[in-house]
Amino acid sequence: MLTLVAKCLSKLGISLVYSYLCTIKENDMQKHTSIQLFRYEPTEGVAEYHAMLRITNPKLTYAEQVESLLAAYDQLLRTELAGTVAVFKRWFLSDAANQANYLLATQVEQSDCALSIIEQPPLDGTKIALWVYLQKGVQTRTLSHGDYEVSHGGYRHIWSASNFNQASKSEYQTRLLLNDYIMRLAEQNCTLANNCIRTWFFVQNVDVNYGGVVKARNEVFLTQNLTEHTHFIASTGIAGRHASHEVLVQMDAYAVAGLQQEQIHYLYAPTHLNPTYEYGVSFERGTYIDYGDRRQVFISGTASINNRGEIMYPGDIRKQTLRMWENVETLLAEAECTFDHVGHLIVYLRDISDYAVVQEMFEERFPTIPKVYLQAPVCRPGWLIEMECMAVKAIHNDNYKPY
């Protein structure tokens, strides 16, 4: 039925965007995996896909869960998503110290894109989950420092994943991470201020180490002319662990070369949120980029906050979830988007006992959007929940090259 609808819309010149549950059951391992898939398929140009793969049987061993996900992903590429390439993967693990090396060994033959591996335990009781961002109609290559380039339409999209070092403090690690990234961008004739669109900072023991991340980021950003008078970068700063206990901060990032500065817009939602610099941090609430044929939206990690920077509904997970949705919805609306344009949701919870309530709420409101629920305390202890997302919407703008 979906294929028939797609063909009919294609004849009318309408881009197809939809999300649905795709369960592949080819062998005994694949039957333990569920796949939620979002498709953005314009009649011309690059198609975009978000896939969220999760295990349905938590009793499987870790090796069996990995095998099941890999088999289902391979089958997905050979069937539903034939002809696509992955541009970014993030693996969510329950115990990175005991799991990451095994997973990396399986990826040697599948190192086809930027690869992020982080300990953020799936809250459904399984050991591993996978988010994949895929595209069709692009050229890809690995850059000298391991970053991953996706090119098409006169743009170069640079994905960087699993960056870390082992300096003695979170502040020093963050400063080294950012300075190294700035140098890598310079090799691609890019800058942090003009080209970096999105960052993720995963912080071990976030209640203790996040302050060092904030201090270093503020100081480095100042040297790059990223201030309250210019702009910052959309970001998530959340709990997450590397396999090594000595790694206090891990960073992923996304940059685009070839943009005009007029294509980049920042989201504020001042009726609901305040500028982050007012409480001492430096990131944008969200960013959208206009191309000739589409608008891409990147919503930062967003919690239950008001426009005075205060935590809304302390201790009440239901009300915090509702306020968080309202905040994200307002940011999306500023980009002339709705949740119908969202490709995936990542939901972070501090307290695992809130999972049943939150999962029920999300499944009722967003049954088909690809999503994953993770144990990952937010940067401020009073925030019980946080979420992030990406969205895409068809537009037409003759001032810019198509995506």
Describe each model-derived feature in a short phrase.
Residues 12-13, 379:
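Intrinsically disordered, low-complexity, charge-rich segments with an acidic bias
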Residues 20, 25-343, 348-403:
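N-terminal presequence-like segments and the immediate start of the first folded domain
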Residues 3, 11, 17-25:
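Short, positively charged and aromatic/hydrophobic N-terminal segments
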